[in-house]
Amino acid sequence: ASRTVPRLEMDMNRMFPGDASGDMMERITAAVVDSIIGSDICMDLHASDIFVREIPQVRLSEDFAEALLPYAKMTNADMIWMNATATVHESTLAHSLNLLGVPTLVLEMGQGHDIHRSFGNQIVDGIFHIMSEMDIWEGPESVLQEPAVSSDGEVEFIRSAVDGVFLPLIEHNHYVKKGDL
């Protein structure tokens, strides 16, 4: 799946909140927003791109972090990244819905537009927990993990400096400090 509009090569997640009187794409994004208004919560799920492998994480804009952090901690994600990247900034679905009063979390995970089943199951456990807290779900719940919470400057992507095959010296989802490798 892709959020890029075929043939137009336009990123739909940079067109929100849309305009009901605008062009075709503005009308579509406005209709999406309109269909979600009034919801108790929204979770915007993203699989990472083909060059990045990411642990399950919630990305929050600093503008809404105080209100969203309690929900984010219930998602069962490995990490909460505050003020992280463009996925939570203006013209995105999450930013627009948060401005309009719908608490919206961006969950990012996986690699190559693929969400591994274990990551999906982990987040589904969190979704059931949130539903239970909101009195929507009465079934059994899994024990949730405590996520690491980070603000800008505390998260680094590890990437190869040159073209070729990149073989990391550490496993995914480990803390690394200067001098460790």
Regions found by a protein language model. Name each.
Residues 1-181:
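Structured catalytic-domain cores with a bias toward divalent-metal coordination
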